[in-house]
Amino acid sequence: MGAKPGINLPIEHNNKIIGVVGITGEPNEVSPFGEVIKMTVEMMLQQEFLLKEIQLEKQTQENFIHDLISGRMGNDPDLFLTRGQIVGYDILIPRVALVMDIYQFEKTTKQSLQAFKGSKEGEIHLQRLKNDVLKTIQGIFVDTPQEIASYTGGDRFVVLKTINLKDSDEILRKKLFRMGKRIKDTISQQMKFKVTIGIGEYHEDIWGISKSFKEATQALDVGTKLEGAGDIYHVDNLGVGKLLAEIRGESQQEFMEKTIYSTKNNKEKKINETLLETLKAFFDNNLSISKTAQTIYVHRNTLLYRLRRVKEITGLDLKKFDDAVQLRMALKMRIYQGSNKFK
């Protein structure tokens, strides 16, 4: 049998022939269709190539940001500065870290993956959800391209906010809180997520960004444990919370056992829940009898009786500074260790 008439057209990409389109038929008749098919295939290849380039660029940018906040910069600062310039960031600009926890974001993404039964579409939906959050954040900084935003895993995102070193500490802090509130409100309104934010301090040199990130993470973790989610916490406002973060859990447990818990192996309380709540209200009202009584809606004499009971049970006298500090620390530790009763 003889060869059938037809045409073969080369498929080109980046000035290289990577394939051939073959169409059977009279050349004069099929040639126009061949050109259309050739053009369509080459356009599809170009789109796929550009998509991969964009994905690679995003991945390169994310890798750089993660190295920056984790302090993995290698032994050559100049090389790291060059990496930053390649992805569009001047990391010599002073910045402070804001770490955001988006309540149940990870749970939402897991549910999305399960809904798609682990298919490729589920992963695409997950990436789209992350990108939506980042676009919402980046939309706030549309006029300031040197602000850095990234997803860091779990429920968390980070913003590395540029700052003006001419600002006083007070002015800088107010600006950061205003920016944090704007981010929190925007995400809450547009995406219906509850957001908690931790803010770090400014530190010099390129390694200072990772220090600020760690502080912002600590502010977020400690603030959420002690005061609850949905607020903004600065590392310098943690008070004794910063100290608690440095004390081992076992040491905290031992301290509570000597003050408000009776035995080592369980949490049967020396003082009951009512007394603990009364004690917390007393501290929250700066040891004011009248304000505390008003806050918890009890008579002054009832409050005084409860405070005497605390002394009788624990052996600690709230009129003595050292004893009051011990009880205050024990209550803070109780909340920090996971009790949500007082939040």
Where does each model-flagged region fall?
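Cytosolic nucleotide-utilizing catalytic cores of signal-transduction proteins
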Residues: L79-A97, D101-K343
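N-terminal functional module of multi-domain proteins
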Residues: K16-G19, G25-V30, I93, T144-Q146
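Generic detector of intrinsically disordered, low-complexity, polar/charged segments
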Residues: A3, K16-G19, V195-I197, D236
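Short beta-strand-to-loop transition segments that serve as allosteric relay/switch motifs
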Residues: G19-N28, T162-L165, G200
